Structures are given as C-alpha cells and as structure tokens.
C-alpha cells in the first residue's frame, strides 16, 4: 500500500494554522469543548450513510481516491500492452467492477478451495492444508505466523507467532454478556450460519457447523490476551530456539506449517502469547476432525465473501460494516474496486500517482527540509548541559543513522511475476487474487 498524505498537498488548497470555520465559536468550551472545537466541521460535513465517522483525514482520503480512480480508469478503458503494469492495473480493476460476471459465477471460484478442506482425511493433513490456505490468504490457521524486527535487536528480523483465529478480533465479543455484546454475538452466529447455507449446506448442517466454529473461537478467545495485555511489549516477547518451540508446543506440526507457509528454516522465534498457542494445541487434539474442518470452511468463505457475488458481499457488509461498525450504506463499487487494486498493486498505483502529483523536485525539497531538521537537532543535542558526552555521542550517532522515507521509495516493487488475465473467468483467477478482492471490507 502507498501513502498519499504528503503527495496530496501539492494538488490541493494550502491550509495553515487552525481553521475557525471548523469550530463553533458560539459554544462554550468549558461546557462542550467538542462542539466548540469541531462544531463547524460537523455542520459543514454531515455524516453520510457510508461513514461511521468523518474527519479531515477522511476528506483527504476522499480526495486521493478520486485522483487514483481517474488514473486507474484511464488504464482500464484503454488497451494496454500485455504484461505491463498498466494492463495489470486496468484488468484487475475491470475484474473487480464486473458484478455481472461475479453474480453469474456465484460460488464457482470457491468450490475448489472448499473441496480441498472437505477432502481432508486426518488431523495431520488438516494442519498442512490450513497452512497452505493461509499462505493464499484464507486466514484458516488458529494463530498468526509472520516476520518482523526483533524488538531487542532491531538489526535482526525474527519469526513471530501470535494469537489469532478469532474473526471478531477482540476477545470480549465472545465473553462479555452485556446487551450490546450479546447482540453482536447473535448477529455473528446468524452470519456464520448464513454463509454455510449460501454454499449449499442445509439448515441443520449449517447450525451444527456454526456451533463448532463458535465453540472453537470462544475457546481461543478465553485464552487470548486482552487489549491491555497486548500493550505490554515485554510481556508479549518470548524468544526461543526452533528446537525449543518443537519441544514446548508438540501439538502443532511446525515443520508442515513452516514449509506450507513458504518459510525457510530458521533458528529463533518469539511466541508472543504463550497461553493461546497452548489452547490451539488442545483444540487440535480435542475437537473432531469434522469440527475442525467446519472452522476452516468458515474462514475460507468469510475471507472470500467480498470477492463473490452481490449476495455474499451484502452478507459480509451487513455484519462487519453495519452491525460491527455502524455503517448504513455500502461504499460505491468503484471505491471497492480501487481498494482491490491498491491491495494487490498498491506500489504500482503509487508510482503512477507520484509521477503526476508528487514530482521528484517535491521529494528533493522535503528531503532537504528533513536534513535541515537533523542538523538543527544535532546542534541542540551538542548544546545540552544535562547530557553526558558519551550519551550525546550515542544520540548524534542515532540521529545520523536515521533512515528518511519521503513520498516514495528509490526502488519500486517488481510485479513482473504477477499475471492478471482479464479474459479469464473469475473462477480461473488464483485464490490469491480472490482473497485480494476481499480486502475492501
């Protein structure tokens, strides 16, 4: 994905300082400071059904989307040489906009993936298959597996294993019993059951599968860290060797998982949350294979719902956007299609964007500004009386090694291996692309 915050400033009206037009100066700040500070903005920008909130960054995003849409649609409307970035961007946008074909295909793109889950014969095979699906975007595993900088040694990357597996995101949705939470949970159960019936299950089977999914996710949620616990950096860092991982968590087939996810061999890993991972071991051992397959099936359908026909999209929107977030109206199809293209080819779109709206001269000016700030800060560090010479030296060394990122990278991502053929039926597009279409939730 690419950031357009600074770039937009070169194509928009320049605003400096605090705008009194966005305030309500008739309100008393001591009584209602929010109305005083933002009343003018709220009156000038009444909330539309598409949004649950609307601030200045949302307005900036709207402006950017309109500019990006113009760039993308220009490529989509005119033939592009096969294999070029323009062809890939235009073809993907057209695929995302083609609701007629998607409605005609229905669940056809999903059938091979569901068949793969339903054909699992053992719990050992289950772990391999869900890892393979996870790599393709189905999020079928019960934990997250990735790579990030080691928090105790930023010069090194480290494999991270973290809690996951719960579609509602926050554990309290599964555990609290207040009326609002119960309403969300009941809507979630109805949503799970609806997705199963939409892929062909009868009501009885869909009910049974829904109960299995909810039971598994609730068990994971009970062991998961709360939002407060997740803010404890040190409490979410448990570095160990790969050998120790195999010893401490024998209920998970780590070799099958690692290879299916495409990870090379590695020596060290951090299990960020210990207890949820042990709970996954219990679930894999205690639940029947049919229950585990029901969980994986739901994760696959849920991940792809926004990429399928309008009925699946509506079901996903009604739960995640309307019930969970309060939005009353879905975004226009073009906005969702732009989101799809950004999700798959964001760097390529970003390259086109900066060529038009953020020229190299603008980047050079901003880099020079940052360099001047570094010099000024360095002089201030040297003049500090309370800082020891050794500490000053370390601070200046850190300042000089500050990696500046402005506007866009010096080296762009290579998309040459990515093939998007607009002439193919949507069902022939790989599941990776199908998942990419689901990014605009």
How would you name each of these model-derived features?
Residues 41-44, 168, 219-228, 375, ...:
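Secretory-pathway/luminal and periplasmic proteins that interact with or process carbohydrate-rich
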Residues 13-21:
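Short, Gly/Pro- and small/polar-rich lid/capping loops
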Residues 75-368, 372:
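Noncatalytic, helix-rich "gating/capping" subdomain that lines the substrate-entry/channel surface
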């Amino acid at each position: 994905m690419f950031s357009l915050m600074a770039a937009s400033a070169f194509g928009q009206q320049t605003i400096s300082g605090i705008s009194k037009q966005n305030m309500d100066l008739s309100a008393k700040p001591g009584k209602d400071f929010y109305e005083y500070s933002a009343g003018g903005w709220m009156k000038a920008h009444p909330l539309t059904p598409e949004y649950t909130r609307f601030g200045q960054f949302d307005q900036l995003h709207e402006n950017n989307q309109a500019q990006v849409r113009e760039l993308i649609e220009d490529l989509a409307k005119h033939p592009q040489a096969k294999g070029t970035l323009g062809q890939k961007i235009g073809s993907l946008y057209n695929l995302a906009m083609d609701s007629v074909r998607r409605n005609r295909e229905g669940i056809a793109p999903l059938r091979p993936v569901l068949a793969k889950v339903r054909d699992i014969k053992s719990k050992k095979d289950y772990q391999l298959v869900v890892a393979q699906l996870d790599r393709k975007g189905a999020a079928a595993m019960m934990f997250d597996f990735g790579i990030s900088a080691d928090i105790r040694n930023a010069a090194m990357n480290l494999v991270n294993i973290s809690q996951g597996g719960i579609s509602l995101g926050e554990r309290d949705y599964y555990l609290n019993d207040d009326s609002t939470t119960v309403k969300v949970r009941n809507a979630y159960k109805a949503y799970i059951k609806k997705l199963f019936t939409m892929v062909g299950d009868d009501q009885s089977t869909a009910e049974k599968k829904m109960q299995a999914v909810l039971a598994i996710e609730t068990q994971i949620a009970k062991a998961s860290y709360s939002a407060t616990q997740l803010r404890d950096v040190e409490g979410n860092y448990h570095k160990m060797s790969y050998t120790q991982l195999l010893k401490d968590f024998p209920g998970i087939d780590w070799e099958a998982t690692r290879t299916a996810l495409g990870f090379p061999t590695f020596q060290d890993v951090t299990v960020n949350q210990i207890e949820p991972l042990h709970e996954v071991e219990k679930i894999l051992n205690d639940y029947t294979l049919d229950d585990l397959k029901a969980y994986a099936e739901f994760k696959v359908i849920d991940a792809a719902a926004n990429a399928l026909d309008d009925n699946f999209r509506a079901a996903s929107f009604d739960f995640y956007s309307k019930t969970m977030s309060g939005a009353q109206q879905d975004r226009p199809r073009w906005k969702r299609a732009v989101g799809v293209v950004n999700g798959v080819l964001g760097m390529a779109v970003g390259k086109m964007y900066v060529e038009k709206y953020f020229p190299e001269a603008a980047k050079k000016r901003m880099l020079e500004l940052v360099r001047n700030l570094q010099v000024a800060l360095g002089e201030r560090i040297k003049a500090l009386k309370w800082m020891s010479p050794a500490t000053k030296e370390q601070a200046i060394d850190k300042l000089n090694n500050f990696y500046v990122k402005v506007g866009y990278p010096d080296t762009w991502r290579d998309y040459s291996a990515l093939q998007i053929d607009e002439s193919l039926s949507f069902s022939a597009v790989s599941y990776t692309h199908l998942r990419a279409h689901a990014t605009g939730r």
